[in-house]
């Protein structure tokens, strides 16, 4: 894929002096499995960053950035060449997911029948489970994209940065020398509530965007003229054990779900794609037990 994939170092840090030993242990654990990283402390490496920290793990090849739009296009095109059929503008408005054959009704009132349906619509899939007691927690995460900056002074190698808070704040550069910062999460108690359905210019959303801009300016005072270019927010779903939900649900026996909820959605989605493919092929992978619905 010509998606400008670029390896980047990453920095996980804490400002809590009580967590210095934890960061040291984390660094040793990463090194033990072959990850090229080192422990930074305020005494040894504070000059690498313009914001204060007590300790952190600096992984030299621990992350990467890509052009996600181009990657998605290339991925679809690659699979079309292998026989995948893609139907754009096909909104499903009704369904019957029986165990023998699944029937989907489109917005244009066409009928699609299939032996199996795989649902991997991310947070939108929660609509399928509104009748259940929630097995997840919801929050809304905010992010801003700045206008391109002239330099990254006070920011070692323009690495990807994440703090150790829960919820956490992250920062990363873009290929065009802009900055993305995300965080300032708001908890959601009700899918029909205000926070769950707010628009981009909701007063509370604007407040969170402003907080993010203030934070990046405080962290990097040597970077001049940091200004917001655009902003966005979205739902974030977590689970009690931090693991995704992959496989079949008892209410929808004609469907598979690949819901990469939790703290590692990209990896979970890849695992789900592999396991579901194996199950459809009749291989019955035992790992599906780990990610099943109704596990707690």
What are these regions (language model features)?
Residues 38-40, 85-87, 226-229:
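General small-molecule cofactor/ligand-binding pocket signal
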């Amino acid at each position: 894929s010509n998606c400008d994939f670029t390896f980047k170092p990453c920095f996980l840090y804490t400002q809590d002096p009580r967590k210095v030993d934890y960061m040291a242990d984390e660094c040793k654990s990463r090194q033990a499995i072959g990850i090229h990283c080192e422990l930074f402390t305020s005494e040894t490496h504070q000059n690498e960053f313009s914001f204060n920290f007590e300790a952190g793990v600096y992984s030299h090849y621990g992350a990467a950035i890509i052009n996600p739009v181009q990657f998605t296009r290339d991925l679809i095109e690659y699979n079309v060449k292998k026989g995948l059929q893609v139907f754009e503008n096909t909104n499903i408005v009704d369904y019957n997911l029986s165990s023998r054959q699944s029937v989907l009704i489109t917005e244009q009132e066409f009928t699609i029948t299939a032996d199996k349906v795989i649902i991997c619509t991310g947070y939108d899939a929660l609509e399928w489970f509104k009748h259940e007691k929630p097995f997840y927690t919801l929050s809304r995460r905010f992010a801003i994209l700045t206008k391109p900056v002239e330099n990254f002074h006070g920011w070692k190698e323009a690495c990807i940065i994440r703090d150790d808070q829960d919820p956490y704040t992250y920062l990363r550069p873009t290929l065009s020398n802009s900055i993305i910062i995300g965080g300032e999460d708001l908890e959601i108690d009700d899918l029909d509530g205000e926070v769950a359905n707010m628009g981009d210019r909701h007063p509370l959303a604007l407040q969170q965007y402003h907080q993010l801009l203030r934070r990046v300016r405080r962290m990097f005072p040597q970077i001049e003229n940091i200004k917001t270019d655009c902003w966005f927010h979205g739902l974030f779903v977590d689970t009690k054990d931090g693991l995704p939900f992959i496989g079949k649900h008892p209410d929808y026996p004609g469907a598979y779900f690949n819901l990469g909820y939790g703290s590692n959605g990209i990896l979970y989605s890849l695992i789900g794609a592999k396991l579901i493919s194996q199950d459809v092929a009749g291989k019955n992978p035992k790992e599906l037990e780990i990610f099943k619905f109704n596990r707690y």
